[in-house]
Amino acid sequence: MNKAIIKEFQQIPGVGKIIANDFWNIGLRSVSDLKDKSPEDLYWKLCQYQHAHVDRCMLYVFRCAVYYASNETHDPELLKWWNWKD
């Protein structure tokens, strides 16, 4: 695992070390890897990796992270993962 990449992921609002490691574990290697990805697909990939149901809040984090990676300018309210609930 590359510490620099983990630090890069932690630049995303709401992403700490554990979630950054989750990103790594499902094959993401940079913030740009999140660009235009399906948050739902990433969430299910994490569930498969962990062989368990993952808390739905993680889906909201994926939505926020994909938004962050896919846009150059950001609405501050959309950088809060809880604003990405269903």
Give, region by region, the residue ranges found by the protein language model:
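C-terminal extensions
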Residues: 1-13, 17-86
